Amino acid sequence: MSNIYKDLEAQTQRSLQNFAIASDQMPAELIHALARIKQAAAITNARLGVLDQERCEQIVAAAIAVAEGQHDAQFPLRVWQTGSGTQTNMNLNEVISNLASQAAGEPLGSHHPVHPNDHVNCSQSTNDAFPAAIHVAAVEGITRRLLPELECLQDAFAAKATAWETIVKIGRTHLQDAVPLTLGQEASAWRAKSTRFRNLK
């Protein structure tokens, strides 16, 4: 697919010009989560009769493609923008609109048959959609990345508890020497603490 933002859409272009601060881009995980919000909104709007089925399917197809990371290059905006994330929300609305236009054989930027505001952003406020996307991205990050790493950490502590069971060290309490213990016991305590991450599930 060609680069949709060779000629940037209006809202995205304005944001790049108004917030030309550093180079920290919006995390792709957040973009993907926001695309899921757009997908869910389109389905709900269609069920309520607010959006016709054809446009719903076009938005859903484009949103899924974005959520799967197929169009990450189309999101050049920085994290430095207004606090509500309005610019990123509009960036995504414009990308989904253009993807739908392209799929329908219409020129990019035509906003036909899917308009960024009237259809992609239908029944949404950035003040709701963006925080919801943050929560979705956080849950996915915890589930897919953090929890598996914590499982590995717990296993590593268990292995060290066994490997270090004969190494005696002095305990420390309030920066003073305390009761001796083995390094294995200390590693075992770390392992016990690490099991608490299961509450995140």
Feature annotation, model-predicted:
Residues 1-201:
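Conserved, well-structured ligand/cofactor-binding cores
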